[in-house]
Amino acid sequence: MNYQNDDLRIKEIKELLPPVALLEKFPATDRAAQTVSQARQAIHQILQGKDDRLLVVIGPCSIHDTEAAKEYASRLLALRDELKGELEVVMRVYFEKPRTTVGWKGLINDPYMDNSYQLNDGLRLARKLLLEINDSGLPAAGEFLDMITPQYVADLMSWGAIGARTTESQVHRELASGLSCPVGFKNGTDGTIKVAIDAINAAGSPHCFLSVTKYGHSAIVETSGNGDCHIILRGGKEPNYSAQHVAEVKAGLAKAGLPQQVMIDFSHANSSKQFQRQMVVADDVSQQLISGEQAIVGVMIESHLVEGNQSLESGEPLVYGKSVTDACIGWEDTDKVLRQLAAAVKQRRG
């Protein structure tokens, strides 16, 4: 009797474009490569305490419309140039969305937002957009969710995040150990920081794991470890951005033998999922900077051209420049918050 025990729940398997095909079609220009290299170096210097500016990762919760993303990028670039003495501004360019249950998983997974899952098209769109943003002189940041996607886009990322749901995952810690950019680990969804501290230690060490080559072949990868990893406070059961929370995290980092560096996410549980409250967090963090707090090295902000968010399920035409995932602050508040942070950094210098 023949027993069929394999692929019982697999509906379809399609070939994925090898990374090299995309890298050859959309090669990094000298300008884009320079943007990435200089931003990574600047972030490294901030993490080393050799640059007293503030790292600001700001942008849409997720990218669903590349035209709106390009307009946002051009506006942000002007502010980056104006405030570069105080801030290292990097655009949040998130193509993949980890979901607590189900939902749209982002531009790479489902670029046409119709459950057609044209991943090859999604990867093309993502790399092309990243190339255009970096080519303009604006560095980009992203979240890494799997071991394969980085081969298509990681050379154009100046900073990376490992999210709250994946910080505890061994696979993501191994991935971070081999990424060429600095990486932030979020505290756990319950607010605990131990998982992030463990992740920083793990990612700083060498690892050996399975991945794919640029030619799309299965491979054994050995890494040297990533010394540019840090914690991101995103709240949990309650917010954790206050001076008291920062002091507690500093103590935890010191106890673990890690540098006392903290990045604060203004959104997620720190804003209690209310996008306007990001401005309240900004006020508090600015005060901490003005008071001379050196441990705060960076912030994350969810912002778009139009404030709020909209549902993909509503059947209504989509509003240009408005998030389809988490609600974001709009452009007016974006301009305001960046200027506020720059002023706070100036005052921190004394």
Segments and roles (model prediction):
Residues 66-78, 101-109:
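Glycine-rich loop at the start of a catalytic domain that most often binds anionic cofactors/ligands
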Residues 2-6, 86-241, 245-246, 268-269, ...:
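Active-site-facing alpha/beta catalytic cores
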Residues 18-27, 223-235, 318:
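Gly-rich Lys/Arg/Thr-decorated short loops/hinges at beta-loop-alpha junctions or inter-strand turns
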Residues 59, 264, 330:
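Conserved, mostly hydrophobic/aromatic
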Residues 47-50, 78-84, 128-137, 222-223, ...:
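Acidic (Asp/Glu)-rich catalytic clusters
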Residues 8-48:
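N- or domain-start disorder-to-order transition segments that initiate the globular core
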Residues 55-68, 326:
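Conserved phosphate/anionic-ligand binding catalytic regions in large, soluble enzymes, centered on
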Residues 304-347:
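Internal helix-turn-beta structural module
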